[in-house]
């Protein structure tokens, strides 16, 4: 087995286990150690080509409760922390005014 094949197999394992990193805006902080972040997906319509926006809301674990409503945050996928929480807060990119 060549060295290149071994390196390719290692690269595939790393990509498979990579965590999703997203950014969005905080819309709610009413729960303890949990924030609700709104994420925006942009997709092009298959037939007409128009760029369409779709928003989704996810619950995010905020251990130190540092984020506030309106803040732009970066979140990272993690193991399931509860029924709905699968993300954790990585950093606050921009504070709300």
Swiss-Prot record:
One of its GO terms (biological process) is translation. GO terms for cellular component: cytosolic small ribosomal subunit. The keyword Ribosomal protein applies. InterPro entries: NA-bd_OB-fold, Ribosomal_uS17, Ribosomal_uS17_bact/chlr, Ribosomal_uS17_CS. The keyword Kinase does not apply. Keywords: Ribonucleoprotein, Ribosomal protein, RNA-binding, rRNA-binding. It holds the Pfam family Ribosomal_S17. GO terms for molecular function: rRNA binding; structural constituent of ribosome. Residues 1-20 are annotated as: Disordered. It comes from the Bacteria. Part of the 30S ribosomal subunit. One of the primary rRNA binding proteins, it binds specifically to the 5'-end of 16S ribosomal RNA. Belongs to the universal ribosomal protein uS17 family. PANTHER family: 40S RIBOSOMAL PROTEIN S11 FAMILY MEMBER, SMALL RIBOSOMAL SUBUNIT PROTEIN US17M. This is Small ribosomal subunit protein uS17. It comes from Corynebacterium jeikeium (strain K411).
């Amino acid at each position: 087995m060549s060295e290149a094949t071994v390196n390719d197999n290692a690269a595939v394992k790393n990509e498979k286990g990579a965590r999703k990193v997203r950014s969005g805006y905080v819309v709610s902080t009413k729960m303890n150690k949990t924030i609700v972040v709104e994420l925006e997906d942009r997709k092009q319509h298959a037939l007409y080509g128009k760029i369409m926006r779709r928003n989704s809301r996810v619950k995010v674990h905020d251990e130190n409760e540092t984020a506030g409503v309106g803040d732009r945050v970066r979140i990272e996928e993690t193991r399931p922390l509860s029924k709905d929480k699968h993300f954790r807060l990585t950093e606050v990119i921009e504070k709300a005014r």
